């Protein structure tokens, strides 16, 4: 398995730099053709979501679709996929950020009875409590 950094994933998804896109695609194809999966940890996933939303202006619906496609890709392994799936489910109808949804999902999976926050939007999510 080969882990990838945010810039490789963003270049692969956005394709705005053809040289880097081709390098990323070649690297990913090589791994897959050798029977290996590509690993995306949650820090990379969160940073990618932030970059695509803030720098490229991708709408939430496109982000939901993009992350769902990564989850469904047989050659990609996301860190703690059940937490990512839960976060996506929550995020669909929430005003909070994806990061907050993932924080809540992860904390719940680790047995936390609640997540305390100063974030008004996040405090409205199930499993969160306002500080």
Label every PLM stretch briefly.
Residues 1, 104-131:
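Acidic, PIN/NYN-like endoribonuclease modules and their adjacent C-terminal/linker elements
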Residues 1-40, 55-62, 68:
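Short, well-structured N-terminal submotif of metal-dependent ribonuclease cores
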Residues 5, 41, 96-97, 119-120:
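Histidine- and aromatic-rich ligand-binding microenvironments
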Residues 8, 44, 83, 102-103, ...:
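Alpha-helix capping/helix-boundary segments
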Residues 16, 42-44, 65-93:
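Acidic catalytic patch
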Residues 35-38, 75, 111-114:
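Short active-site oxyanion
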Residues 83-113:
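A mid-sequence interfacial segment
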């Amino acid at each position: 398995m080969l882990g990838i950094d945010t810039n490789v994933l963003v270049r692969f998804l956005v394709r705005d730099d053809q040289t880097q896109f081709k390098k990323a695609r070649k690297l990913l194809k090589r791994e897959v053709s050798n029977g290996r999966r590509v690993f995306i940890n949650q820090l990379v996933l969160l940073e990618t979501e932030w970059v695509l939303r803030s720098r490229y202006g991708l709408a939430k619906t496109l982000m939901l679709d993009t992350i769902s496609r990564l989850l469904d890709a047989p050659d990609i392994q996301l860190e703690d996929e059940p937490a990512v799936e839960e976060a996506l489910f929550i995020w669909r109808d929430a005003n909070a950020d994806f990061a907050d949804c993932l924080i809540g999902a992860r904390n719940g999976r680790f047995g936390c009875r609640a997540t305390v926050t100063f974030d008004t939007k996040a405090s409205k999510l199930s499993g969160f409590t306002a500080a």
